[in-house]
Amino acid sequence: DTVIMIRSGYRKFVTFPSPYLLKKGCYMPSVDLVDMFLRLAEKYGMKFYFGLYDSGKYWDTGDMTWEVEDNKYVIDEVWENYGSKYKSFGGWYISGEISRATKGAIGAFHALGKQCKDISNGLPTFISPWIDGKKAIMGTTKMTKEDAVSVQQHEKEWDEIFDGIHEVVDACAFQDGHIDYDELDAFFSVNKKLADKYGMQCWTNAESFDRDM
């Protein structure tokens, strides 16, 4: 019943002809995928969640603040051109991915979540972070890492993050692919406890592949 576009663009490649992003040097897409997905979602009675734009600057710098500026314009454009026209426009995915207390993350999630909700009369918003577990080894040559986050530290950091964003972020879908199978219960129990504490929905992002193959 739901389809989620995980991001509307990454660096110079975009899924819809955004006047703002095209002016900044992004490539004109051959098909307006956002319009197509919304039309198809309407046809089949599904809800479409729009994923925000990812400039790549956060990945380059570790500072989430970069992602707010571009998305200010993207959110306005998308609501005006699509959200206000299609009943299938069901919500927003704030596409910045973090795993730990990250520079600028609380402020960025709050600013983006608030703008999304304000412009769309309160449509739902969600995030999908990863857990900094033993399989979180992107950008290294290792199969696992030694300094994986403990359940206690994960709880402490996400308690602080949820405290700062729960008014404008409705749900959190932790990715499940970065921790060991026998750690799932411990981490997911904490995730549910924190979501309940702050009145958020606790979803799961089931990664149907294993990272330690």
Each model region followed by its residue ranges:
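Glycan-processing catalytic domains of CAZymes
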Residues: 1-213
